[in-house]
């Protein structure tokens, strides 16, 4: 057994203290023959500190495309030649999407908008949408609408938004290579305000943007410092017309190593499968991740890419004897 896994068994599994950056890097560098042991340990950590339940979430885009930022991985940027065009979703369609999400057994519905930050129109739409969903659907409402002011944070709290997603996307040292229209520090400031407001913080990123293994370890350590309630792990699904559109996808074994490493860095955090897993991991890899530290999934489609059918994921959870987290448990 590699020394880092022996260390993690005592430090993380028994004592609940996550690995530091050096420890995460050691896990990311484990040879293939030790990957099953790393995944098994990560699963034990998840079961010990989070329990067997899996949180299920659906997402929908209130405003798609036309974003002024230049995130190099994103087909919703108005600066690139991707086929995505700006579209607004009306409130009845938003409510219907929430109803369909709830029917899958999901406990959370996240409203997303492709913006730098919300303007007055978007805040009005969000307020109307959240109120309409709360009136008709028994589901928690989360939001992801970019960088916020303190006033906007307070408004979201007043609306009853229980969790806010704002991804750092990658580590601080690599961020300028994928975004130039705003800074990593600006994103961190929004997350600070959200945390202080009492809303739950959801913050993760995308692996496979061109970062080094060392930078993946840096990213895990920075997320652990933030200590978010939830970390969504995306794997790059290269989008045509974007600067990263010709990048190779993350190798499946590297993705699984990252899942184990991030779990060992953050033993108590909800670690959620997000975009790109279908391409990077397929069905077998998805199962391996759920047995290697993952304890939440986004079901259905993503913002601009297709996901797995919700029934496929729910059948997999049933097959693995992993109960879906009940709504009452998240209130």
Swiss-Prot record:
Pathway: Cofactor biosynthesis; biotin biosynthesis; biotin from 7,8-diaminononanoate: step 2/2
Transmembrane segments: none
GO biological process terms on file: biotin biosynthetic process
Domain of life: Bacteria
Record's catalysed reaction(s): (4R,5S)-dethiobiotin + (sulfur carrier)-SH + 2 reduced [2Fe-2S]-[ferredoxin] + 2 S-adenosyl-L-methionine = (sulfur carrier)-H + biotin + 2 5'-deoxyadenosine + 2 L-methionine + 2 oxidized [2Fe-2S]-[ferredoxin]
InterPro entries found in the cross-reference section: Aldolase_TIM (IPR013785), BATS_dom (IPR010722), Biotin_synth/BioAB (IPR002684), Biotin_synthase (IPR024177), Elp3/MiaA/NifB-like_rSAM (IPR006638), rSAM (IPR007197)
Family note: Belongs to the radical SAM superfamily. Biotin synthase family.
The name this protein goes by in its record: Biotin synthase
